[in-house]
């Protein structure tokens, strides 16, 4: 039912990256780098001319599809509010409809298990089970 893959991140210019996926692409513009490394980028969707109100860590960018369909397609990122690098949360983005939902915590590990997606943080031992995208608290961007 669910399929998860790492997104391909392509370096475009000195401060811009592109993430391509079946339903389009998103551009990541370098904004800052926290003391521990890992670049943090603003997120722009050129097809819809929308910018995400969060910045994205340049790591663990995943594409999630349901039954390998481009009609039911999502992206998972580790994100922070702009101009910050703490308070990391996972966001699920539905690019086709310009909306996102926060999982309200940080889960660096993501995997599929028996028709559900398991987000897990081995540091805090917290887990988030996602089996229905309609149950998320969606916000437009």
Give the residues covered by each predicted segment.
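Short beta-strand elements that form the blades of beta-propeller/WD-repeat-like
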Residues: 17-35, 71-81, 116-122, 127
């Amino acid at each position: 039912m669910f399929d998860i893959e790492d997104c391909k991140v392509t370096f475009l210019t000195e401060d811009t990256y592109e993430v391509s996926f079946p339903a389009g692409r998103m551009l990541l513009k370098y904004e800052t780098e926290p003391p521990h490394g890992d670049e943090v980028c603003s997120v722009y969707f050129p097809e819809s001319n929308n910018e995400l109100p969060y910045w994205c860590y340049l790591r663990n960018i995943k594409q999630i599809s349901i039954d390998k369909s481009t009609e039911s397609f999502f992206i998972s990122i580790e994100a922070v509010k702009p101009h910050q690098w703490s308070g990391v949360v996972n966001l699920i983005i539905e690019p086709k409809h310009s909306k996102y939902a926060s999982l309200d915590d940080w889960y660096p590990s993501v995997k599929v298990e028996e028709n559900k997606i398991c987000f897990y943080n081995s540091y805090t031992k917290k887990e988030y089970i996602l089996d229905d995208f309609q149950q998320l608290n969606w916000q437009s961007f």
